[in-house]
Design a protein with these regions (language model features):
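Binding-site signature for planar aromatic cofactors or substrates
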Residues: 1-149
Length: 149
């Protein structure tokens, strides 16, 4: 329940708090995004959306309007707003067949237990920079401290 097609050239994707925040840092630096969808049952197919995107964080002015597009989810971290420039399909014959056994609920349960203060602290500690040290601006900080290995 985290992807919305707004029109033929725009999608928005709600992203939840997790251990890394690579996409936010790299979209901020290069603004390019690719979303890939694979058919794991039925006819083989891969669909890719190519375009430009921006990360909308909880502290950004556009957050309130964009977040209303989704059902509230514990741990909501940012929304990626993507302008689609190109849609491409490919055969998908190399994609294995999988049967979905169900959704995992652990991330939602974890975020619920953490609560908003705990999530904010977690994002400050774990999501301020990408693995390669790029800033994510997750909590509105202009210059995050670079973590030493």
């Amino acid at each position: 329940d985290s992807l919305r097609v707004i029109d033929s050239n725009r999608v928005v994707w709600l992203n939840l708090t997790g251990s890394g925040n690579e996409t936010a840092a790299h979209v901020r630096e290069f603004n390019r995004m690719t979303l890939m969808f694979c058919a794991f049952e039925g006819n083989p197919l891969i669909l890719r959306l190519y375009g430009t995107a921006r990360a909308i964080h909880r502290h950004d002015p556009d957050w309130a309007d964009c977040y209303t597009l989704f059902n509230p989810l514990p741990g909501a971290r940012q929304i990626f707003d993507m302008q689609v420039d190109l849609v491409q399909t490919s055969c998908g014959m190399g994609v294995p067949l999988f049967t979905c056994a169900g959704d995992r609920e652990q991330l939602i349960d974890w975020a619920t237990r953490k609560g908003e203060p705990g999530l904010k602290q977690y994002r400050e500690e774990k999501n301020r920079t990408s693995l390669d040290g790029k800033p994510t601006y997750i909590e509105g900080n202009s210059e995050p401290e670079i973590r030493q290995p």
